């Protein structure tokens, strides 16, 4: 009886975690297929932050303007900003380096499959990087941000939502545990939380605050912040 219960427990554990790769990657069909539901379970504020991004796109997008959605995944931002794109005859270029994500993309606009490190942005009005930089090699993050600040139009904006380092000491520990608690309360199993945390080792690294000295904070939830760079009206 005890052996049967043990076997059942392992079967349940495997069924909950079998889709999680040993080394986290978005170049994975199972990850792409689970992405939309999983990210909302893991980050209960995901849709709230999406609405915030859409608000700032509306605030900075001129008529006939261009939005870049960099690290577009399956099209979350594209769908959120469709109303303002339609109202202002705006255009969208969505960029992602995962063929698996691209196969499920439904955010509208033009989809470009490219590594952000290699992507040279055209002149644009608004760029969005929504939970992207933490998955990019730290040595290459500044290059991406510098290119964007060079290419953004006068009066435009760069909008960031990403994970940042926790403060030192016990408060930092408590903030991280808040993130874990939010996941558990959203229905993510403890086994899935643990496997995902181990999978992310070396694959997801918080973004250094020093990269954003000229950005303004508009959101903070636990380990995550929303920032915006408003481009000067005269460049």
What are these regions (language model features)?
Residues 128:
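A conserved beta-strand element that flanks and buttresses the S-adenosyl-L-methionine
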Residues 155-163:
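Conserved beta-strand signature within the Rossmann-like core of class I S-adenosyl-L-methionine
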